[in-house]
Amino acid sequence: MPGTPSLYAAIDLGSNSFHMLVVREVAGSIQTLTRVKRKVRLAAGLGADNALSADAMERGWQCLRLFAERLQDIPPSQIRVVATATLRLATNADVFVARAQEILGCPVQVIAGEEEARLIYQGVAHTTGGADRRLVVDIGGASTELVTGTGARATSLFSLPMGCVTFLERFFTDRSLTQEHFASAEQAARDILQPVIAQLRGQGWKICVGASGTVQALQEIMMAQGMDERITLAKLQQLKARAIHCGRLEELEIEGLTLERALVFPSGLAILIAIFSELEIECMTLAGGALREGLVYGMLHLAVDQDIRNRTLKNIQRRFMVDIAQAGRVAQLAERFAVSVEREWALDDLSRALLHSASLLHEVGLAVDFKRAPQHAAYLVNNLDLPGFTPAQKKLLATLLLNQTGTVDLPALQQQNAVPLRVAERLCRLLRLAIIFASRRRDDMLPDVTLTAHDDTLTASLPQDWLSVHPLGAEMLEQEQLWQSYVHWQLDVK
């Protein structure tokens, strides 16, 4: 049976989990159709002689039988299957790989550590915003990849022999979570890091992103607990203290930590603490993609877009038939307003960039219906895949769109954690006013309005007689003053 030409599949035979990603290309990006993940814990089957046990191999083959059914619909030339650290180490890897290829009907490539690091970096570069120099950290089941680079180009690639499964079996064998066990795991990780620290520091970076299950788990924990999404050493130490307090792995309970991730969380946490300490990392955020995305984008031969957020915004505007000219007017006004109050209101570049993004998407809900358009817009943004935006940033965008007009939902603004609450409130106010002043949908009808701020009092100064000449606009502003006053936001119009 012929395959579907537009489909691509990437399979990652990892040391902890096997993953399958099936996508199709849409407008220079990828649309995910299927994600399948199974905890195989292949690394746990490595014996002292580095031979894989029969049980571990059978767990892997059983998982691949599930994957094989889906691969029947995809041309073999559009499938890539790679195996990583455990199968690099296993003395009987050829036995596992030969049977795996029979099951899948396509080649399985055991890739070197540096190639794994390169693919991880490509996946990050294609899916994670920012043009600055970056450090990418991926803690796998049996290896940890550390990569520095700028844009599409990796400048240093390292694959180190430490992972959350191998460290679990080595340092938490009895499943007790003690200070001593953590200390031993952290010291071992520091020792492994020593030969590469100088070169990594020499490359330097401005942003650090994590692309592993450990970092995903941390993100889920922080979101569940209402913290901001920035991972810091202080937060890692707090989580370690919580784990030690729980005492045993089977009793590990941390709000936001799923049962599926709990088993290898302490060992991954110990490795990450060592990385933060040795490389003096200030903060880390979650990457948008990693190895599997790197494989897919490699098959598609797509160039890395230096402005991933802009590509994402344009794709959404096109998909939902947004009036691009009107979105641009609102974005232009919102930026003008932000510039006029940025010093008084301490709006940084990221906050202004997120305001710009919200402005460009504010009418996306009209594609569903005019009624409840802000709610539709918020739902869409919350649930769409937005490469270049972190989960917390997506939530902020959705919250701003929800509050673009009408009664202000203050609890929704309080629940986002991408920016401080006061900043979120201020971005909301600027967006609402930009939408009002651009409501005539014509460039020549944009008023020469000036915004000034003093603490939380916002003053809109309009040309003489503007209010009398534009009675509908005056009424909209009067209503907006009321809505803002309900949440104790002072808006003066003169």
Curated annotation (Swiss-Prot):
Q: Which pathway is this protein assigned to?
A: Purine metabolism; ppGpp biosynthesis; ppGpp from GTP: step 2/2
Is Transport set as a keyword in this record?
no
InterPro entries for this protein: ATPase_NBD, GppA/Ppx_hydrolase, Guo-5TP_3DP_PyrP, Ppx_GppA_C, Ppx_GppA_N, PyroPPase_GppA_Ppx
Keywords per UniProt: Hydrolase
Catalytic function, reaction form: guanosine 3'-diphosphate 5'-triphosphate + H2O = guanosine 3',5'-bis(diphosphate) + phosphate + H(+)
> Which molecular function GO terms apply here?
guanosine-5'-triphosphate,3'-diphosphate diphosphatase activity
Q: Which Pfam families match?
A: Ppx-GppA (PF02541), Ppx-GppA_III (PF21447)
Please provide the Gene Ontology terms (biological process) for this protein: guanosine pentaphosphate catabolic process; guanosine tetraphosphate biosynthetic process; nucleobase-containing small molecule interconversion
Q: Which cysteines are cross-linked by disulfides?
A: none
EC number(s) recorded for this UniProt protein: 3.6.1.40
Task of the protein: Catalyzes the conversion of pppGpp to ppGpp. Guanosine pentaphosphate (pppGpp) is a cytoplasmic signaling molecule which together with ppGpp controls the 'stringent response', an adaptive process that allows bacteria to respond to amino acid starvation, resulting in the coordinated regulation of numerous cellular activities.
- Family under the similarity heading: Belongs to the GppA/Ppx family. GppA subfamily.
Q: What name has this protein been given in UniProt? A: Guanosine-5'-triphosphate,3'-diphosphate pyrophosphatase
Q: What is the lineage of its organism?
A: Bacteria, Pseudomonadati, Pseudomonadota, Gammaproteobacteria, Enterobacterales
